[in-house]
């Protein structure tokens, strides 16, 4: 049944904050705080973090089944996961073994510490933004302004020095280096200085292309140290981990009571082989943190809360939103097959490639065709796999950790978040629709009357000065009359708009019924405080436009 729109109804909806084309009951995804199950969260301190999302018990069971299914398929000895929103952890769980065999064997749970590897890069980026916001550095300055020994060789003889911004967005021209860099965490400052002095190479001109570089983030870690005057690990702990109350560490906790997962790799014919831990060093900035699923979800939820204007914590919401903006587009590459005979993890059959993906500051950003922007990061270290991802519009997210090399837990996290978002969307759209300005609605009512009964005076009162310059009023009136003839003429309902929709507060599209068809009308307002219609088009639904 067509949706009728009138000025009073539209303006009443606008006053109530209702998106264009939606009923008043669908404004919020959820209206209560159902909190699961075995792990409950306290109310957030220091103010609201935006709407808390309810995730039903059957959805959480489906999420848990994703990760238990992965373990049954042999992807890792153990796993831990959490579902979160802007208010914190909604539900969390774990299964399998954090440590295999022996007296110290233990089960994995949401408090178990795993290496989160490259998820640490979000802390490195946040540290640089914090220093920038304090006026201590400029992201557009060359990195060698802070680390003089970093002067990479650029192909083609171009005289371009990678800036902090380029390195932060994975466009510094440096080559992908995961296997090598993952083994260099403990490198000393002296060894790193010697490495850079000996020279490094770029594979592309800095600032021109995406290529994921750990070396670039190790350089950024040194920038933090030299500007802040303290070790990178100390700065991140002091400025972020401690103020936010996160259970995270750059060294394996020495407390015997601490639950720490052991990392494993699958050895041919030998099953799982335990791998040694590495200690902090220069490459801690690329992936050095230990974190639990709960604490990583708290961090991700705090980043997600920036979209609700949450100003708690050390970094302002504007800078946290900046981290989650796509700044460098990346080509979607096929995933490599797991090595050493590790079974391929189950993949959601309905998985959809993003429309576009790339890198922000310490985070990947992708645009999902169904749900819109998703922020994420994966982490892979010898013996560990980590992933965090969230839907920026709703704040719903998933964290997942496994203790095996090449486990690719990102696949499970992607599937789990789609389950959570799909369940939420069955109750109400998870991506809010834009709400038209009152002036946009008023213009649509006046222009609907104008289309039925043209008046130059009415047109002059509603339309911006460019409109008659683009197409004169007389030409517009004639084109509109021709359009009415194409749909069999006017009816008593022709001045009543139906099926209104918008893509921005200054925009509306609606339809006016005729005898045998309908006209499509579109308006887009100017950006002024007292806006007028700068775009006004009328056409037969399905035909070419008759105005501009």
Regions found by a protein language model. Give the residues of each.
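Short, well-ordered beta-strand elements
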Residues: 387-390, 394-404, 520-524, 533-540
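Short, conserved catalytic-motif segment at the N-terminal edge
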Residues: 54-116, 136-138, 149-153, 189, ...
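Short, gly/Ser/Thr-rich active-site loops of penicillin-recognizing serine hydrolases
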Residues: 334-336, 372, 399-475, 544-548
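Short active-site loop at a secondary-structure junction
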Residues: 69-82, 102-167, 203-215, 284-287, ...
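Short solvent-exposed beta->alpha transition segments
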Residues: 457-503
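Exposed beta-sheet edge and beta->alpha loop/turn motif
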Residues: 496-548
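Short, surface-exposed loop or secondary-structure junction motifs
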Residues: 88, 98-99, 155-375, 380
């Amino acid at each position: 049944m067509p949706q009728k729109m009138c000025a009073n109804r539209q303006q009443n909806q606008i006053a109530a904050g209702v998106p264009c084309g939606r009923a008043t009951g669908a404004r919020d995804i959820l209206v209560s705080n159902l909190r699961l199950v075995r792990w409950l969260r306290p109310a957030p301190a220091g103010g609201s973090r935006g709407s808390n999302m309810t995730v039903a018990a059957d959805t959480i069971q489906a999420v848990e089944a994703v990760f238990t299914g992965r373990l049954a398929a042999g992807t890792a000895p153990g796993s831990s996961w959490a579902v979160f929103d802007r208010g914190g952890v909604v539900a969390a769980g774990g299964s399998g073994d954090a440590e295999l065999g022996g007296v110290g064997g233990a089960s994995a749970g949401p408090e178990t510490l795993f290496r989160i590897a490259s998820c640490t890069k979000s802390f490195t980026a946040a540290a640089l933004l914090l220093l920038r916001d304090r006026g201590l550095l400029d992201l557009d300055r060359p990195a060698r302004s802070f680390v003089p020994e970093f002067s990479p060789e650029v192909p083609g003889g171009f005289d371009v020095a990678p800036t902090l911004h380029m390195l932060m967005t994975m466009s510094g021209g440096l080559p992908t280096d995961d296997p090598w860099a993952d083994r260099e965490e403990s490198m000393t400052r002296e060894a790193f200085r010697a490495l850079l002095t000996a020279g490094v190479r770029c594979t592309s001109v800095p600032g021109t292309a995406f290529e994921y570089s750990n070396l670039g983030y190790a350089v950024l870690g040194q920038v933090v140290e030299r500007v802040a005057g303290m070790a990178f690990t100390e700065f991140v702990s002091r400025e972020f981990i401690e103020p936010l109350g996160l259970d995270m560490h750059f060294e394996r906790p020495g407390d015997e009571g601490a639950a720490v997962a052991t990392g494993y790799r699958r050895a041919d014919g030998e099953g799982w082989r335990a791998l040694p831990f590495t200690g902090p060093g220069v490459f801690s900035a690329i992936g050095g943190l230990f974190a639990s699923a709960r604490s990583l979800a708290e961090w991700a939820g705090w980043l997600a809360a920036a979209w609700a204007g949450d100003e708690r914590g050390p970094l302002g919401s504007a800078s946290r939103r900046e981290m989650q903006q796509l700044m460098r587009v990346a080509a979607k590459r096929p995933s490599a097959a797991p090595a050493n005979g590790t079974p391929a993890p189950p993949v959601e059959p309905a998985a959809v490639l993003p429309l576009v993906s790339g890198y922000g500051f310490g985070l990947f950003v992708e645009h999902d065709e169904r749900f819109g922007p998703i922020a994420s990061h994966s982490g892979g270290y010898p013996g560990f796999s980590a992933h965090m991802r969230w839907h920026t519009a709703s704040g719903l997210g998933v964290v997942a950790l496994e203790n095996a090399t090449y486990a690719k837990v990102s696949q499970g996290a992607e599937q789990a978040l789609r389950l959570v978002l799909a369940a939420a969307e069955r109750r109400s759209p998870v991506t809010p629709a834009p709400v038209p300005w009152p002036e946009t609605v008023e213009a649509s009512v006046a222009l609907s009357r104008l289309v039925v009964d043209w008046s130059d005076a009415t047109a002059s009162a509603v339309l911006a000065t460019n409109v008659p310059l683009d197409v004169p009023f007389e030409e517009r009136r004639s084109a509109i009359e021709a359009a009415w003839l194409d749909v069999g003429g006017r009816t008593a309902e022709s001045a009543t708009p139906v099926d209104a929709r918008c893509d921005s507060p200054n925009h509306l599209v609606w339809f006016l019924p005729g005898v045998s068809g309908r006209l499509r009308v579109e308006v887009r307002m100017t950006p002024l405080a007292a806006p007028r219609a700068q775009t006004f088009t009328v056409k037969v639904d399905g035909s070419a436009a008759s105005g501009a």
